[in-house]
């Protein structure tokens, strides 16, 4: 999947949570009304739901335009029940997938939104799975890494409590990751993505001799907090994520927090989704 242009709007910040000394990655979405970038973002999202070839085939078969087909069958609409929620959740999951793949260089299979049974149906299991192989030939190594991310989005508010929710639900990934891996492997195979399906298979054998690897968990939260309050920390100026106390976060050493914020992100999500016409 090509790197989407909107990633140039995402700026990493020095962000902190009070009474919290574990890994925290903080990003601000500093966007504008560049139609080319917004259209590219919309196309990027649409391709998670249905491929170019399948969209063309469906439109030819039914005798409808791509826009009409997408609106009726694929893309959640803001005036539908759960439509805004589906838009918020999906654009957020794809954003964090893009960060992990294009910034942190994990391979992140894209199959979660493909061939859903309904426009607002949410798949169960771990939200995002990514991986890295230590060896170029992909032979199992204990240095291989698997990452599992739980995403929580509140795009209509600027409430940092989304981080608490992400941490709480991320703990569940320790128990559901095996089921998610099995589901992903089979779905990727059905999509014809055989190489990715085989990659996932490697990570289903953690307990097999010679197949151990490292697994990391991410609690990812996103909200419409426009800016962070700046404070001095040593000789550096950092942004403090207010409204949350790190002492309340029961987080282990192999779990980290990603936080993304920006102004009026629900409006941005609708702007992008309304462009999903082709």
Predicted segment positions?
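Conserved catalytic cores of phosphodiester-cleaving nucleases, focusing on short active-site segments
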Residues: 100, 128-130, 147-153
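A short, highly charged nucleic-acid-interacting micro-segment common to nuclease
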Residues: 74-97, 118
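Charged, often glycine-rich, active-site loop that binds/positions anionic groups
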Residues: 120-132
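Acidic, metal/cofactor-coordinating or nucleic-acid-engaging core segments within structured domains
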Residues: 157-232
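Active-site beta-strand-loop-beta-strand hairpin of nuclease catalytic cores
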Residues: 131-148
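A short acidic/basic microdomain associated with nuclease active sites
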Residues: 103-121
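Nuclease-adjacent, charged terminal/linker segments that flank catalytic cores
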Residues: 1-64, 265-278
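Non-catalytic C-terminal interaction segments of nucleic acid-processing enzymes
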Residues: 213-278
């Amino acid at each position: 999947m090509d790197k989407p242009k909107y990633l140039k709007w995402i700026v990493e910040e020095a962000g902190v949570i009070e009474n919290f000394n574990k890994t925290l990655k903080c990003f601000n979405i500093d966007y504008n009304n560049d139609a080319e970038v917004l259209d590219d973002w919309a196309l990027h999202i649409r391709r998670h739901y249905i491929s170019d070839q399948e969209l063309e085939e469906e439109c030819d078969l039914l005798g409808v335009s791509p826009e009409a087909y997408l609106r009726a069958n694929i893309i959640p609409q803001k005036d539908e029940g759960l439509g805004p929620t589906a838009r918020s959740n999906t654009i957020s999951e794809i954003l964090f997938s893009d960060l992990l793949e294009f910034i942190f260089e994990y391979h992140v299979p894209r199959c979660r939104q493909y061939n859903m049974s309904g426009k607002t149906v949410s798949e169960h299991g771990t939200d995002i799975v990514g991986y890295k192989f230590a060896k170029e030939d992909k032979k199992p190594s204990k240095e291989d890494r698997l990452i599992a991310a739980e995403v929580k989005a509140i795009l209509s508010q600027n409430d940092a409590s989304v981080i608490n929710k992400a941490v709480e639900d991320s703990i569940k990934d320790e128990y559901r990751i095996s089921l998610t891996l099995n589901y992903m492997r089979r779905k990727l195979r059905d999509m014809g993505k055989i190489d990715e399906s085989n990659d996932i298979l490697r990570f289903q054998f953690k307990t097999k001799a010679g197949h151990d690897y490292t697994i990391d968990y991410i609690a990812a939260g996103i909200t419409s907090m426009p800016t962070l309050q700046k404070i001095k920390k040593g000789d550096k100026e950092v942004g403090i994520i207010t409204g949350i106390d790190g002492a309340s976060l029961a987080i282990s050493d192999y779990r980290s927090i990603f936080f993304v914020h920006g102004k009026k992100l629900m409006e941005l999500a609708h702007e992008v989704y309304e462009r999903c016409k082709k």
